[in-house]
Amino acid sequence: MFTAVAFKSNNGGLPVGKQAPSFVLIDTKGIPTKLYDFRGKIVLIDFWASWCKQCRMESPKLVKTYQKYQNMDFEGGSGFEIISIAMDDNLDDWRDAVVQDGYTWTNVSEGKKWDAEIAKDYQVSSLPANYLLDGNGKIIAKDLRGLMLDSYLATIRKK
C-alpha cells in the first residue's frame, strides 16, 4: 500500500486524494484521447506550453523519467504514462515543441490557452503544473518535477 503525498506547490489546484476529472482531448494527430483509456496505469498529467521557458527546461528530465519508468509496475498501477496537456493557442508551435523536446508520449491540447476547459477543471493557474494519478484515476501527488518525480515513482515502484 502507498500513501498520498502533496509537495509544496505554487499551483493551488485540485487536492491530493480527489478523483481526477475525466476528459477527452485531441492529440497531435487529431485523434481523441480519453483519460479513461489510461486506467490501470500510473499517469502524470503534465500541464505545459511551448512558450513556457520553465516547462521547456523541464523537458529533458521528463523524457528521462518516462524512459526509465514507462514499463515498470507500481503500487496502484502497472506502467507509467504521461499525458502532456499544452496550454497553447498556436497549435503549430505546440506540435513543433513536442517534436523538438522529444515527447514520445500522449500530447493533447484544446488550443485555447487559459480559456481551455481542462485548465478550469484541473484548477491550473500557473505553469508548469502536474498531477500524478493512480491506476483508478485518483490524484496521489501533484507538482512533482525533476528529482522529486523520480523519487516519488521510485517509492511506489513494486520491488
Question: Where are each of the predicted segments found?
Answer:
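Conserved redox-active cysteine motifs that mediate thiol-disulfide chemistry
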Residues: R39-G40, F47-K68
